[in-house]
Regions:
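Alpha-helical transmembrane segments of multi-pass membrane transport proteins
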Residues: 1-322
Length: 322
């Protein structure tokens, strides 16, 4: 953010809003915890979900690039430095190569049948430690304790949220609340268009207040039966839900990413208020909503890649395979 403001010439509210919005795309780009949670609830393949998130995630990134280009043109913002040479780009690629290799190992290993998603998590940890300690030499043995403590805190917090959401989902199912809500939704939505429109609205609102994993546990069991009954691809449905929740994280007035972004200190005497970032984030939300509509009503944008890579009969999104 400071670099965009001081060197790039962008306004502080715009820069802060851009960082908040772009960071929310992380739950759409594999490997995504939200996809793992969705797959565990619905029984879809984690590999299918990971592959399905690639194109929508890239589309969201392209949409934000367009917003930045329009902002730069509107305020006549010129490049703050010369274009990198071929050698500089190659050097940067070589420095980042080992980091780029991790998602390739995870996704390639899962989709190639070399290891399961759980094993992929273990492999990625070992690989990350190897790269950090041996290749980049930024991690030492002395850092291990702090790393493990931070990991335990993060994992513990996530699992506490997931446990609470799972308990809520269990209570709803036990007392018939989930079935009643599902029947109500089915009675209102008689076709895919209406159903998807209602679901989008629900998830956009839910994403403002609840983190993606909790929202999955609460709403997916209610919506999935209707989704299946209407014949909508459940892998595409999972991607659509995740994109919704990503947008919800930056939707005013309670988008959690907005509060994180405005807490970042840009420089002394320059702070961004919630009102300022709420105005600045509007075009970015509009761009992401445009992508959401494409993903929702043209599901092939998220399904063609997993279908193309899946072995015959192994794709888990089609209703015939559920």
């Amino acid at each position: 953010i400071p670099a965009m403001v001081e060197q790039g010439g962008f306004s502080a509210p715009f820069s802060t809003a851009l960082m908040a919005t772009s960071s929310s795309i992380a739950i759409v780009i594999p490997p995504s915890i939200a996809f793992v949670v969705y797959a565990s609830i619905t029984g879809t393949s984690i590999a299918d979900m990971f592959m399905a998130g690639i194109v929508p995630g890239l589309l969201m990134g392209v949409a934000l690039i367009i917003v930045v280009m329009l902002e730069a043109k509107k305020h006549n913002i010129k490049p703050s430095r010369e274009k990198a040479s071929g050698k500089e780009r190659w050097d940067a690629f070589k420095d980042a190569f080992w980091g780029f290799l991790m998602p390739v190992i995870i996704l390639g290993g899962i989709y190639g049948g070399i290891f399961t998603p759980t094993e992929a998590a273990a492999v990625s940890v070992v690989y990350g430690l190897f790269v950090g300690m041996v290749i980049y030499r930024e991690v030492s043995i002395r850092d291990m304790f702090d790393i493990l403590v931070d990991s335990a805190k993060t994992t513990g917090g996530i699992m506490l949220i997931v446990a609470s959401a799972s308990l809520f989902s269990f209570v709803c199912t036990k007392f018939g609340i989930a079935d009643a809500a599902s029947n109500l939704l089915g009675s209102i939505a008689h076709n895919q268009f209406t159903f998807l429109l209602i679901v989008n609205i629900i998830f956009l609102i839910a994403g403002c207040f609840i983190d993606a994993n909790s929202a999955m546990y609460i709403f997916i069991p209610i919506m999935l039966p209707v989704c299946k009954a209407l014949g909508y691809d459940i892998v595409a449905f999972g991607v659509m839900a995740t994109v919704n929740l990503a947008i919800g994280q930056v939707t005013p007035p309670v988008g959690v990413n907005l509060f994180v972004a405005i807490s970042i200190k840009i420089k002394k005497g320059l702070e961004v208020t919630l009102q300022e970032i709420s105005r600045a984030v509007v075009p970015m939300i509009a761009a992401c909503v445009a992508v959401l509509l494409i993903v929702t009503y043209i599901p092939i944008t998220s399904t063609f890649l997993p279908k193309a890579l899946a072995k015959e009969g192994s794709y888990t999104g089609d209703q015939s395979s559920v």
